[in-house]
Structures are given as C-alpha cells and as structure tokens.
C-alpha cells in the first residue's frame, strides 16, 4: 500500500471526485489542497508518496509545483492532470518531473491506477 497521497486542484468538487476514485482503489490516507501554497504545506508535513496535480491553480500552475516537488529530499510520484487534453501537456509534465499526464475525463482509467501504484499491466 502506498503512503499518503495528495490531490491538488482549485475546484473542491474535482478534488472530492478524485479522492473518491482513490478510495475506491483502496487508498485511505488522502490529503487535499486547493493551491500551490496549500500543497507545499501539506507536502512538508505529510511527505506524500503520490501527488496528483491540476495544471491550473490560483497561485501558480501544476508544472511549476511539480518542479518544486522534485526538489524535495524524498521520492514522490507526481501525476499532472487537466481538463485541457492538449498533447503538449504530456511533454510539459515530463519536463516538470511528473511521471505522467492525464486529461480529467480519463481519471477513472486503470492506466492511471497502475501509474500511481507503480504497477505493470500484468499485476492485479
């Protein structure tokens, strides 16, 4: 089982949806943040193993936050997501140090679950 997870999105309804998805996959320790500042506070306190970050945040963007998280002295799996499915977001997420990018309409994808849990296709 993974350690704490963090969902970062300025829309509380989206955060709630992502939390429900993660709980449905068996994850219990899930934090929420609505801004870059809240995310950084959470990260420094709880040291999550996975952070799901929306691109658009009120005090920055998910790519900048991903770069800041990469500077932390422990390993985190960072996934960037957005309602904008522009293919350029994949490359931008990778450059920012994220392990992947998902459009918000694909958040229920088994591929996302495997990615955040660091599993291959043939693992249960």
What spans do the regions from the language model cover?
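Two-component/phosphorelay signaling modules centered on CheY-like receiver
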Residues: 12-31
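Acidic, metal-coordinating helix/loop segments flanking the phosphotransfer/catalytic sites
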Residues: 32-50
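Acidic catalytic/metal-coordinating carboxylates
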Residues: 35, 61-64
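Active-site T/S-Asp motif of two-component receiver
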Residues: 53-54
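The feature encodes the CheY-like receiver
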Residues: 58
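Short amphipathic alpha-helix used as the core "switch/output" element in two-component signaling
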Residues: 63-74
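Alpha4 helix (beta4-alpha4-beta5 surface) of REC/receiver domains from two-component response regulators
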Residues: 64, 85-102, 106, 110-114
């Amino acid at each position: 089982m993974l350690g704490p997870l963090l969902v970062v999105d300025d829309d509380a309804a989206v955060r709630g949806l992502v939390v429900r998805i993660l709980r449905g996959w068996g994850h219990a320790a899930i934090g929420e943040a609505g801004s870059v500042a809240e995310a950084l506070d959470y990260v420094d306190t709880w040291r999550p193993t996975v952070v799901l970050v929306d691109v658009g945040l009120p005090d920055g963007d998910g790519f900048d936050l991903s770069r800041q998280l990469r500077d932390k002295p422990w390993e985190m799996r960072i996934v960037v997501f957005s309602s904008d499915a522009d293919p350029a977001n994949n490359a931008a997420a990778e450059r920012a140090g994220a392990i992947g990018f998902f459009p918000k309409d694909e958040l229920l994808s088994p591929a996302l679950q495997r990615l955040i849990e660091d599993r291959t296709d043939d693992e249960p």
